[in-house]
């Protein structure tokens, strides 16, 4: 079986373990930096190139960093269109990184969670803050992971200032009530 591991670096522990295990089991295996892949999107003939040569695999194992979800998922989708099986589908990669979608589904299912607001226009910030509750507020970048892009604001004014600052760079943000029992854990 021809196996492609889509990763930024073979030196990453998980990538090197996958590579060694696949080789040990007799698979023709290659680690490919998905950021260095480029695609040719044409009628009925999707193609992917890496370092100047066309590549194709029977199976791909995506190791896509959160920062590169959009591009990484596009590369995986192109392999899927070429007939490769993927350990994680392009759709599942995209969905798993969509915090807003996950929160909407969790909230709709009745699971306890912090009250969360989402707003597009700056003029509606104060209104959405009131729907979330009273300060403190947790302000989160939708694209942030592992605690990056999270701000705790103690007052409504501080929350408005933080949100307006994030909005200046067209960031999508979530506003959540602060749950004191969480001890600062997300």
In which residue ranges do the predicted regions lie?
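Phosphate-binding site of ATP-dependent enzymes
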Residues: 150-186
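A conserved helix-loop-beta module that forms one wall/lid of the active-site cleft
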Residues: 27-34, 76-149
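Short, structured patches in soluble enzyme cores that scaffold and shape functional sites
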Residues: 7, 118-120, 140-143, 154-155, ...
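ATP-binding N-terminal substructure of ATP-dependent carboxylate-amine bond-forming enzymes
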Residues: 1-87, 101
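Solvent-exposed alpha-helices and their adjacent loops that cap or buttress functional pockets
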Residues: 52-54, 130-132, 142-145, 166-167, ...
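Short catalytic-loop micro-motif centered on adjacent basic/acidic residues
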Residues: 4-6, 61-62, 88, 114-116, ...
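Short glycine-rich, flexible loops that bind phosphorylated cofactors or substrates
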Residues: 68-70, 146, 182
């Amino acid at each position: 079986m021809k196996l492609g591991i889509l990763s930024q670096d073979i030196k990453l522990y998980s990538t090197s373990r996958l590579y060694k295990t696949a080789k040990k089991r007799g698979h023709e295996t290659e680690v490919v930096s998905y950021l260095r892949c480029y695609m040719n999107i044409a009628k009925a003939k999707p193609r992917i190139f890496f370092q100047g040569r066309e590549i194709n695999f029977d199976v791909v194992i995506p190791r896509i960093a959160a920062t590169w979800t959009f591009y990484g998922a596009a590369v995986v989708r192109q392999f899927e269109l070429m007939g490769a099986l993927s350990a994680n589908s392009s759709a599942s990669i995209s969905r798993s990184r969509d915090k807003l979608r996950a929160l909407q589904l969790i909230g709709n299912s009745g699971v306890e969670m912090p009250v969360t607001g989402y707003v597009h226009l700056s003029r509606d910030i104060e209104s959405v803050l009131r729907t979330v509750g009273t300060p403190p507020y947790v302000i989160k970048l939708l694209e942030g992971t592992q605690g990056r892009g999270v701000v705790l604001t103690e007052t409504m004014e501080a929350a408005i200032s933080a949100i307006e600052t994030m909005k200046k760079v067209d960031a999508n943000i979530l506003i959540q009530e602060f749950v004191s029992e969480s001890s600062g854990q997300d």
